[in-house]
Structure formats: structure tokens, C-alpha cells
Regions:
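Binuclear metal-dependent phosphoesterase catalytic core
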Residues: 65-67, 148-158, 164-199
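A short linear-motif detector with a strong N-terminal bias
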Residues: 9-11, 37, 49-51, 109, ...
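Short glycine-/acidic-enriched loop or helix-start segments at secondary-structure transitions
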Residues: 11-13, 41-43, 81-83, 140-142, ...
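Conserved catalytic scaffold of divalent metal-dependent phosphoesterases
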Residues: 43-141
Length: 199
């Protein structure tokens, strides 16, 4: 499972070499959309899955299966500022226009995620792993619509990335929280080694 930012190419034709590299990796490859994946928008998921059938699976508005778990996911969205800080780096306030824009994007991503959960449940699955590119909460939040839907569907784990650099690794939930395991899998956080979500 790769949680986003697969290529810097803006068009599919510019990404083929990167996707071919991913194809050559061992095992089954399921891709989630990241904020840098400009070649892939929601309307293209179905056509990408048709073109790469049997080689790569693009996870958005659908679900994949591993053992007895349905794998659901979406890019997500997290408000990342700008924040206004005091001299000690404490947050005094933030840009409310940017926050409002982020809330609209969260609503859109939640619609996609709920559709994926619904499809998986209709297919008979009752165990879920939820994947996001962005972290499930911002540094201002303890909970969010993403943590709420994870609890609603009693997911086994929430797996996310996007947070890079030691100063950002603590931006969201890690470890056990309200009965759900939250895993940060950014490449630099893991030392560029795969993480085991399920045995």
C-alpha cells in the first residue's frame, strides 16, 4: 500500500516511468492519491484502474481487499495554516479564510470516504483499514470528521503520511487512540522501510 505522492509529473504521460518503477516492486501495489499526484483526479480513477488492471490498483471511491479486511481510502485534507505565533512559537490565531477552504475540502473527501465504506459494507465486509494521505487531524484538533468515521466503522487502523521532517511527525495522532491504531507511514519517518499494518 503506497499512500501518495507517487510522481511529480503533472500528466499521466510524464508519470509512466515512475509508475513502471512501482510496478516492478515485489507484491501487489495499491496506490492512494497524494497532494502531489497531479496526474490523477477523482474522475480518472476508473480509467486508471482499467489501464493498469492486474498491475496497479488506484484506491479512491472504491475499496480493495486484504485477507478479511476491506481497504478504504482517500487523499483527505488537513488545515495547515497559516498560523500566527507568538515569540515562543505558540499559536495565537490562524487564517480563517484558509480554514474555511479546508473545511469544504474535508466535506468533499468525507463524501468519497463514506462511499467507499458503504460499497465495502454492501459487499459483506465488516473489518476495515482506512488510508489517508493527509493526517487525520490538524495540530489544532484532537478529533475530526476522519477520526469520527473511523470510530463509526470501528476500523482496525488509520494509516496516513504527508508529515515530513522530525518537527512535523507529531502533528497528528500516533499509536492507540479510542480503540483504533493510528500509523504515520511517511518515508522519512519510517527510514524508508515498509511498515506492517496487518500480519
Amino acid at each position: 500500500m503506497l499512500t501518495g505522492d507517487h510522481s511529480w509529473g503533472r500528466k499521466l504521460s510524464e508519470c509512466r516511468e515512475d509508475l513502471a518503477f512501482i510496478e516492478r516492486l515485489p507484491g501487489r501495489k495499491i496506490l492512494l492519491r497524494g497532494n502531489h499526484d497531479m496526474f490523477w483526479d477523482a474522475k480518472k480513477t476508473e480509467s486508471l484502474n482499467e489501464e493498469f488492471k492486474g498491475r496497479l490498483f488506484f484506491l479512491q471511491n472504491n475499496f480493495a481487499v486484504y485477507q478479511d479486511h476491506a481497504l478504504v481510502g482517500t487523499k483527505g485534507c488537513t488545515f495547515e495554516g497559516p498560523f500566527y505565533l507568538d515569540g515562543r512559537g505558540r499559536i495565537l490565531g490562524w487564517d480563517e479564510e484558509s480554514e474555511a477552504r479546508a473545511k469544504k475540502l474535508v466535506a468533499r473527501e468525507m463524501t468519497r470516504l463514506r462511499s467507499s465504506f458503504s460499497q465495502a459494507r454492501d459487499a459483506g465486509y465488516r473489518k476495515f483499514i482506512m488510508f489517508l494521505h493527509y493526517p487525520p487531524t490538524s495540530i489544532l484538533e484532537e478529533t475530526s470528521p476522519f477520526t469520527e468515521i473511523a470510530e463509526e466503522y470501528q476500523v482496525t487502523a488509520v494509516v496516513y503520511s504527508h508529515c515530513h521532517g522530525e518537527s512535523r511527525f507529531g502533528d497528528s495522532i500516533r499509536g492507540e487512540y479510542r480503540g483504533i491504531r493510528y500509523m504515520l507511514v511517511s518515508g522519512d519517518y519510517l527510514g524508508f522501510r515498509p511498515a506492517e499494518v496487518l500480519p
